[in-house]
């Protein structure tokens, strides 16, 4: 489901809610670099020249974690490659000035903690204290096989015949079956949690058929409630909705599908109501899980018509955190926005990307950042991205099929792999075969990826790892075009148009995907024909 940022977010990036700030200045150590706080680098289709990547630069604009999650996961955590970290249970604002990290908080003066000498040392110390592993993970199928989301192909036209056809097309095109996500909108109203029988004549039979084909079925949802629905009347009466600022009346909040009321997830009765609706869907139709969308911080910011009031003084981050706590109760789940849910049994997804080479370049950096704030179970968005306009009225003479191939290859050796646009619709046979091979590679590696996920439930370490995390002090501080899959595989996908790239190998010996051994500690040039995803297995 497409997330649309609003114009005032640019203002939010420099705006602070804190009326009585306590300011901390963390002076830089020699060659120190800082990472963390956010998964995303920018909102969808931000020009690449305007994007700052991690590690942060010596001078960075102030960003307020209370109002801005950049459309993705966020955490009150910053970590450095010199073994230092910053954590605060409450959201704070931060900026960089001439290399110094400046922290702003209304709760307490924030100090840096030193525990080790490397990025990994800093992460492990913070993780063990503040977001230790839960011992649980999303269902194994989410890692073992590709996922299929109906957003791009069906958008707002989700219905039973089209959904069943997509499932059949997966099989007839020899793609592995896996998780199947029905997207927006399958009910009559937002906040209504039953199938629209005008579009779904027999939902139980549909789910049964998808199960028989080898799929598990998830449904999309948000905390929003249509204000003209019967659910709104009930929820308002039972004090389950976010209220308008300084009143006891339900607020109407602007989001990408208009104006709606919103469940107040800090209210136990609201969470209980939603939980009951979801478990009823499971009991009635055999639904396996849910895609939890929205809960972005800006819906509840100073510029929105909510908080504070006599009823509640909660915040956007708290709403997102509570949404995640509910989602963790379901074996199959997916989240895009989140707060302080590190190492919980949540499948996180990168925010929607556009279909361009510039947007492709964000996948690896965002996945690396997700790992560094405690999200090992992450999906790198939909293959090709999640923008409808990129796949409507396609001119097949000019459509860039190479980009679709490289997008699929990037995901093949990541924790999760998700299709939405049907590759058999937009690709010729040559390019479709290569994308199919990428899906089959993910399935082939599925058991190994699942073992990494199981390991993360115990040790809390990322699955997709920054090279600086894995190989400190070897010059990888700013390396964001390649990544480690666990401890064993270095993956170096193509991120721009062409058929050659450089790969910087850490010290040691490495066996590449073609069977050739390389001595590390140097940069090599490699050929990357269209059907190749370069990866290197660590030897010894």
Model-predicted regions and their roles:
Residues 64-66, 73-75, 135-137, 168-170, ...:
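Generic recognition of flexible, low-complexity loop/linker segments
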Residues 1-21:
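Bacterial Sec-dependent N-terminal signal peptides
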Residues 169, 173-174, 209-216, 325-326, ...:
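Carbohydrate-binding surfaces of carbohydrate-active enzymes
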Residues 19-142, 160-172, 470-471, 525-539:
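Catalytic and substrate-binding clefts that recognize carbohydrates or anionic sugar/phosphate headgroups
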Residues 72-76, 81-84, 91, 145, ...:
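Extracellular structured ligand-interaction cores
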Residues 52-55, 176-436, 468-471, 486:
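Aromatic- and carboxylate-enriched substrate-binding clefts and catalytic-loop regions
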Residues 84, 91-93, 153, 187, ...:
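Short, glycine-/Ser/Thr-/acidic-enriched flexible segments
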Residues 138-153, 249-262:
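N-terminal small/glycine-rich loop or linker at the start of catalytic domains
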């Amino acid at each position: 489901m497409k997330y649309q940022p609003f114009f005032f977010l640019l203002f939010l990036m420099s705006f602070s809610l804190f009326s009585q700030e306590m300011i901390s200045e963390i002076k830089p150590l020699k060659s120190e670099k800082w990472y963390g706080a956010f998964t995303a680098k920018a909102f969808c289709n931000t020009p690449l020249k305007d994007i700052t990547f991690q590690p942060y630069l010596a001078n960075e604009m102030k960003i307020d974690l209370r109002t801005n999650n950049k459309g993705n996961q966020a955490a009150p955590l910053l970590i450095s490659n010199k073994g230092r970290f910053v954590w605060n249970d409450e959201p704070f604002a931060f900026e960089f000035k001439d290399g110094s990290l400046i922290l702003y908080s209304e709760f307490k003066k924030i100090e840096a903690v030193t525990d080790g000498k490397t990025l990994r040392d800093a992460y492990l110390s913070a993780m063990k204290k503040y977001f230790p592993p839960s011992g649980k993970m999303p269902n194994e199928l989410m890692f073992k096989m590709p996922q299929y989301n109906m957003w791009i192909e069906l958008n707002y036209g989700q219905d039973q015949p089209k959904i069943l056809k997509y499932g059949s097309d997966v099989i007839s095109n020899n793609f592995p079956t896996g998780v199947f996500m029905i997207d927006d909108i399958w009910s009559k109203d937002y906040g209504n949690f039953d199938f629209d029988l005008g579009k779904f004549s027999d939902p139980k039979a549909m789910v049964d058929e998808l199960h028989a084909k080898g799929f598990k079925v998830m449904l999309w949802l948000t905390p929003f409630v249509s204000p003209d629905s019967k659910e709104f009347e009930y929820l308002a009466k039972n004090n389950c909705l976010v209220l308008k600022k300084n009143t006891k009346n339900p607020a109407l909040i602007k989001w990408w599908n208009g104006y709606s009321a919103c469940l107040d997830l800090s209210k136990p009765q609201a969470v209980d109501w939603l939980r009951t609706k979801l478990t009823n869907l499971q009991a009635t139709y055999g639904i396996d899980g849910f895609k939890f969308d929205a809960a972005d911080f800006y819906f509840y910011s100073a510029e929105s018509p909510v908080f504070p009031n006599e009823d509640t003084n909660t915040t956007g981050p708290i709403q997102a955190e509570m949404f995640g706590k509910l989602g963790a109760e379901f074996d199959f789940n997916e989240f895009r926005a989140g707060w302080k849910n590190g190492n919980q049994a949540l499948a996180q997804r990168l925010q929607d990307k556009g279909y361009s080479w510039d947007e492709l370049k964000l996948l690896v950096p965002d996945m690396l950042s997700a790992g560094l704030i405690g999200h090992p179970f992450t999906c790198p968005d939909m293959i090709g991205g999640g923008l409808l306009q990129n796949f409507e009225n396609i001119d097949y003479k000019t459509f860039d099929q190479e980009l679709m191939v490289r997008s699929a290859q990037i995901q093949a050796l990541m924790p999760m792999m998700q299709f939405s646009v049907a590759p058999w619709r937009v690709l010729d046979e040559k390019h479709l075969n290569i994308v199919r091979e990428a899906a089959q590679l993910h399935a082939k590696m599925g058991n190994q990826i699942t073992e990494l996920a199981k390991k993360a439930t115990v040790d809390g370490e990322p699955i997709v790892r920054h090279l600086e995390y894995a190989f400190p002090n070897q010059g990888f501080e700013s390396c964001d075009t390649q990544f480690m899959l666990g401890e064993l595989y270095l993956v170096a996908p193509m991120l721009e148009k062409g058929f050659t790239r450089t790969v910087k190998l850490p010290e040691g010996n490495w066996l590449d995907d073609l069977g050739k051994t390389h001595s590390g500690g140097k940069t090599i040039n490699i050929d990357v024909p269209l059907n190749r995803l370069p990866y290197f297995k660590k030897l010894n």
